[in-house]
Amino acid sequence: MNTDINNYIVRNNQIEWQPLIEKGIHYQGISVISLRFDGAKQRSTTIMLKFEPGATYPYHNHPGGEEIFVLKGEAILENVTLSQGDYLYTPVNFKHSVTTQKGCIMLFVVPEEVEILKTNKLFTNEKN
């Protein structure tokens, strides 16, 4: 293990927002910064997402759960508004979508790859 702490720091001046593209899908109005890349899993497990006003991430499942901390703005998950400073932990196999009216920046810890679910529902309590 490398014991130089500098190898584990992500400096603000070293990173830029990139469009969120997963499996060839470009999510309009959502940008990402990777904070921790897991080489064994070949994916980022700690990220920041920036949602422009009106942006939506589709209904999906979290096989490994998820942690969210709202850094700025407001996000809506399952018809519940999370605001700056709010924290959410979702258990294994929790399903939801994310949208925002005002825009937001959130910190995510996502141990396993999400699974996009084919549905017309934006929230689980809506009917098809």
Predicted regions mapped to residue ranges:
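Short beta-strand/loop turn elements enriched in aromatics
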Residues: 37, 51-62, 112-113
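Conserved hydrophobic/aromatic beta-strand scaffold that supports enzyme active sites
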Residues: 32-34, 46-50, 67, 87-89
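Short acidic-glycine-tyrosine-enriched beta hairpin
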Residues: 77-96
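Short histidine-centered beta-strand/loop micro-motifs
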Residues: 47-49, 58-62, 79-80, 98-100
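A short, N-terminal "cap"/entry segment at the start of jelly-roll beta-barrel domains
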Residues: 1-43, 123-128
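Ligand-binding loop in jelly-roll beta-barrel domains
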Residues: 30, 92-120
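Glycine- and acidic-residue-biased ligand/ion/polar-headgroup-sensing regions
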Residues: 52-55, 62-77
